[in-house]
Amino acid sequence: MKLAVIGGDGIGPEVTAEALKVLNAVRDDIEVTDYDLGARRYLRNGELLADADLVSLREHDAILLGAIGAPGEVPPGVLERGLLLKMRFALDHHVNLRPSKLYPTATSPLANPGDIDFVVVREGTEGLYCGNGGTLREGTPHEIASEVSQNTRYGVERVVRDAFERAQNRKKHLTLVHKTNVLVNAGGLWQRTVNEIATEYPEVTVDYNHIDAATIYMVTDPSRYDVIVTDNLFGDILTDLAGAVTGGIGLAASGNIDATGVNPSMFEPVHGSAPDIAGQGIADPTAAILSAAMLLRHVGDESNAQRIEAAVTYDVAERPAGPVKTVEVGDRIVAALQR
């Protein structure tokens, strides 16, 4: 397997090193190419993501990302638009996949969280994040700023189909989250698409939540969810809330997926670069390791994906109270693989 690794900034290289340690413990055929992308490169020479980088990345089977960002050093939006979103659009990562599971001994802020185990399938290349907007009369009392939410039948249908496929292979329940009572045009497109595709999946039950109601249910009754499908902005908000109710983003993994398989998909922990703890060896690499498991599942290695997830579940349950070193977490999970 040809694997592109973008360690990135802050704790990114530290957690990806442990994810690679675990990957190499279950497979002996991984060829790694490291890429110097992120704030460090931008601050050094002003480069973000060159066309040559994209050409090279496309030659790999998958991409593992650590974290990108340098708060206070790089202005907001530079790395997001010039690197992360550019890569997402260029590699057609139209499915953003975020599993949310409450692991044993993980502490949820909810008094009675129940059995939380759902996935959010977020559309990744359209909506309000497509860059369709602008500003007029900037800096004047009459300034106008607009952001246009772009939703196409093609874009909506392919992510809805992906969500139905996942629901078919899970607990067979899908929830559309939107705001159809106000966003009647985009919401209507999403609702019609779900209704039409639902006829192809008679075993999957379907319901609908407004986004504001979904934020309530995710706190009061998160176990009601199996697969959530939603647009780019609503998915961005919901997945952070999902991370919070399952004990924090330290265990939150994600995938940015081209479901067609034409381009390599990218897998990453949800957390940021955390420069305040970088280099101290205390960052929790569990989310990066779970992202590696998602990566293996995507490339068809279900057996080893399940092995890693089982090892993580065992380690989280047995992990001692108090801080655990980054390297030690990786070593513990490798040891758990041998059980």
Curated annotation (Swiss-Prot):
Q: Where does substrate bind?
A: 88, 98, 122, 212
Cellular localization per UniProt: Cytoplasm
Task: List residues binding Mg(2+).
Answer: 212, 236, 240
> What EC number(s) are associated with this protein in UniProt?
1.1.1.85
Give the matching SMART domains: Iso_dh (SM01329)
Q: Does the keyword NAD apply?
A: yes
Write out the GO MF terms.
3-isopropylmalate dehydrogenase activity; magnesium ion binding; NAD binding
Q: What class of enzyme is it?
A: oxidoreductase
Free-text cofactor note: Binds 1 Mg(2+) or Mn(2+) ion per subunit.
The entry describes its oligomerization and partners as: Homodimer.
Function of the molecule: Catalyzes the oxidation of 3-carboxy-2-hydroxy-4-methylpentanoate (3-isopropylmalate) to 3-carboxy-4-methyl-2-oxopentanoate. The product decarboxylates to 4-methyl-2 oxopentanoate.
Question: Know the name of this protein?
Answer: 3-isopropylmalate dehydrogenase
Q: Which organism is it from?
A: Corynebacterium diphtheriae (strain ATCC 700971 / NCTC 13129 / Biotype gravis)
